[in-house]
Regions:
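A cross-family glycoside hydrolase active-site/sugar-binding cleft signature
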Residues: 1, 31-35, 59-63, 87-89, ...
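N-terminal capping/lid subdomain adjacent to the active-site entrance of alpha/beta enzymes
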Residues: 1-58, 63-80, 104, 199, ...
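Conserved phosphate-coordination/catalytic loops
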Residues: 9, 13, 39, 92, ...
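Short low-complexity stretches enriched in small and charged residues
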Residues: 14-15, 42-43, 87-91, 131
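Conserved, mostly hydrophobic/aromatic
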Residues: 30, 61, 86, 124, ...
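Catalytic P-loop NTPase motifs of RecA-like helicase/translocase cores
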Residues: 66, 92-93
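Shared catalytic-loop signature of beta/alpha-barrel
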Residues: 76, 82, 93-110, 115-219
Length: 245
């Protein structure tokens, strides 16, 4: 995940160059931020597809920046770029708008980071407001609750891809959960789980653990030590703690 809108640079060129860098590092998919101006967003999507080449997966994340009319328009136009999913196209409380977007354009709709516990996920899953549900293990209620959400999604044929955002502690937790995920459907070549791997500049993210969780050619190894597989760097916690002035 990356490709935000930054001040002082040409957004289209900046996002395209960033995705080209991800491709050179071995990543097989990338998620870019949209939800600003629909026309500019579509130009960004086209430029990113050109930079990524034909085989790299591209997801678009609206961060609930559109209304349903805009989201449907963007989805219809962006579909020709081979988009894997359209995340949070509209405000998370507007489930009717989610369903309208899902029905009104061809890209699979994803969402879930803003819904909490199985009770918050129940209606989106049961009414198929989304094609892909994205619970955040640190926001939905932890390991037990995300397991319940995964079971509910499987009952209704909704794909689950965890949302991951924060420090290496959350990355480690998500990796341990993903390692336990049951393929849905069970088959000889199951759908491999995707780890959202934040590439934005955040020195705190990896500083909180003694051994960094990094990728090699776009693949992250699951920590194999007890518990989450990590050891907290308490010196870093002190370093980044708020200081009295």
């Amino acid at each position: 995940t990356g490709s935000f809108k930054r001040d002082g640079v040409d957004r289209i060129e900046d996002n395209a160059a960033e995705v080209a860098q991800y491709r050179s590092e071995g990543f097989q998919a990338t998620k870019i931020k949209i939800g600003f101006d629909p026309d500019e967003d579509l130009r960004v999507i086209a430029a990113v597809r050109e930079a990524a080449g034909p085989d790299m997966g591209i997801m678009i994340d609206g961060n609930h920046g559109y209304d349903a009319i805009e989201a449907i328009r963007v989805g219809r136009a962006a579909a020709e770029c081979g988009i894997s999913w359209f995340e949070e196209p509209v405000v998370p409380e507007q489930l009717d708008a989610y369903r309208a977007v899902k029905d009104g354009q061809p890209i699979p709709v994803a969402g879930g980071e803003s819904w909490h516990t199985r009770w918050g996920m129940r209606e989106p899953i049961e009414t198929r407001a989304v094609d892909i549900i994205q619970p955040d293990i640190c926001g939905c209620g932890g390991f037990t609750e995300i397991r319940r959400i995964a079971d509910m999604a499987a009952l209704h044929g909704v794909r689950l891809v965890p949302h991951v955002w924060g420090t290496a502690i959350q990355i480690a937790a998500a990796l341990q959960f993903m390692a336990s995920m049951i393929p849905n459907p069970v088959r000889n070549n199951p759908i491999e789980p995707l780890l959202e791997f934040d590439r934005t500049d955040n020195p705190f993210r990896q500083a909180v653990v003694k051994t960094r969780i990094e990728h090699v050619d776009g693949v992250v190894t699951i920590p194999n030590e007890p518990g989450l597989g990590i050891e907290i760097n308490r010196d870093a916690l002190k370093e980044f703690s708020p200081k009295a002035v």
